[in-house]
């Protein structure tokens, strides 16, 4: 079983692994990487063994899989709330318990819902499926940006890599941070087999700025600015400084999670805001100087109200249910 296609200009300049992931989002990343390592992926009849190799529009691509699947005709579980839509990208409010990319063929995810919402005739140039630019964990809620064109995807990936995109999060944590404002600078090492991340001097540089907004000693509401973008960064960094996220069953506090299990059924982490500076590339001119905020979800808002904490007006949205929160 194999398939070939001529790459369009939407793919020009993209990393091989990311291009394959966007065309075949239903394939596990491990399967894509294994095929590359084994030399089963070819570009113009040459084995492509480097995941980071840049592809060019017009190249002939050969892969050991079937043709990309058709986008589902209707949403499986409803639409994803849209915060903003332009010609280059779509900004959505990701609900909890939803993957960004499908983990199985035809699986439910943000991108498959976006495909269904836009329809097969929309969302960019022919042959390009709208693609998520960054990742949020399954149970993390909030702002997520989806590229609608290949040139926008490349430009956004560059902006994230160059740390031009500002990312602010809210979290409810166990305990109280030692300082009202602190920067956590602790390198992170990922164990892919165990799917865990830990602080290690052998890891990649990771920095998180943490500000305590409210606390009663037992729980605290914190705002986070991710200065880097590592896997599980916010969760591991907060656990590292003794303030694990409430509801986090991987890195959290077992006893606190047990006591709050009815109110915190997931790690209470929310991608609050995504912002872009002026001076972006012309492809992203619609995004220059813009900030996008997602309303605080019901589970986090309920705990804040119960503790008497005041949420700033610009991050609370009583009409959230009307926008499709699940």
Predicted features, each with a name:
Residues 2, 77, 127, 205-207, ...:
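Short coil/loop residues immediately preceding or within conserved phosphate-binding loops
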Residues 134-135, 199-202, 263-266:
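Short Gly/Pro-enriched turn/cap motifs at secondary-structure boundaries
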Residues 37, 74-77, 200-208, 268-269, ...:
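Short coil-to-beta-strand transition motifs
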Residues 100, 106-118, 149-152, 161-164, ...:
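Pseudouridine synthase
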């Amino acid at each position: 079983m194999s398939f070939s296609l001529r790459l369009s200009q939407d793919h020009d300049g993209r990393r091989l692994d990311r291009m394959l992931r966007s065309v075949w989002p239903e394939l596990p990343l491990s399967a894509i990487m294994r095929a590359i390592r084994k030399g089963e992926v070819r570009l113009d009849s040459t084995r492509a063994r480097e995941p980071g190799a840049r592809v060019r529009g017009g190249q002939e691509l050969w892969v050991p899989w079937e043709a990309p699947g058709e986008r589902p005709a209707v949403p499986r579980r409803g639409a994803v709330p849209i915060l903003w839509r332009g010609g280059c990208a779509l900004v959505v409010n990701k609900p909890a318990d939803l993957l960004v990319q499908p983990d199985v063929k035809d699986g439910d995810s943000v991108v498959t819902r976006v495909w269904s919402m836009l329809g097969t005739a929309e969302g960019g140039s022919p042959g390009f499926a709208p693609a998520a630019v960054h990742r949020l964990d399954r149970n993390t809620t909030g702002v997520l940006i989806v590229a609608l064109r290949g040139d926008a995807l490349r430009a956004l990936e560059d902006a994230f890599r160059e740390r031009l995109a500002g990312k602010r999060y809210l979290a409810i944590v166990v305990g109280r941070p030692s300082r009202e404002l602190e920067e956590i600078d602790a390198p992170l090492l990922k164990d892919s087999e165990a799917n865990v991340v830990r602080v290690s001097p052998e890891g990649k540089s990771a920095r998180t700025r943490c500000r305590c907004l409210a606390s009663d000693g037992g729980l605290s509401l914190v705002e986070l600015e991710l200065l880097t973008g590592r896997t599980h960064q916010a969760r591991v960094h907060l656990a590292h400084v003794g303030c694990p996220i409430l509801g986090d069953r991987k890195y959290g506090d077992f006893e606190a999670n047990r006591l709050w299990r009815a109110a915190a059924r997931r790690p209470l982490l929310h991608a609050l805001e995504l912002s872009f500076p002026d001076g972006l590339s012309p492809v992203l001119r619609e995004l220059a100087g813009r900030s996008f905020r997602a309303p605080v979800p019901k589970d986090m808002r309920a705990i804040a109200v119960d503790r008497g904490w005041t949420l700033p007006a610009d991050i609370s949205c009583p009409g959230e249910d009307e926008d499709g929160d699940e």
